[in-house]
Amino acid sequence: MTIVTNQPEADAANEQRLVKSAERVRDLGEVFTPSHIVNDMLNLLPDEMWRTHPPATFLEPACGDGNFLIAILDRKLQHVTSHTDDPQTRQILALAALASIYGVDISPENILGGHPDHPIGARDRLLSQL
């Protein structure tokens, strides 16, 4: 499965700025992975990784603004859409897909947003996919 997701926030803002500031790199070791590299990496995984029953579980221990999490959820949701037509089943499987993805970050604003350079955090970006 080769997927290129539409991540306008990531593509427009973060692709140009892989580093928010020298201070954040120094203090947090923070550097962002562009979505095209995320997709290249995820394309190396077998297709069964995207099934939702039983779901593969993913943990991103340095999730930043969620580029990996968004791409993983997008692939899982595409699998759901292509394997069931029933809206109620799709909804249940979409929630199962979301529940199988975990992200942690040292910086609360990466998760929650609210910084002038980072208004939308990983949490809201993930939830907007549903």
Give the label of every model feature segment.
Residues 1-130:
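SAM-dependent methyltransferase catalytic region
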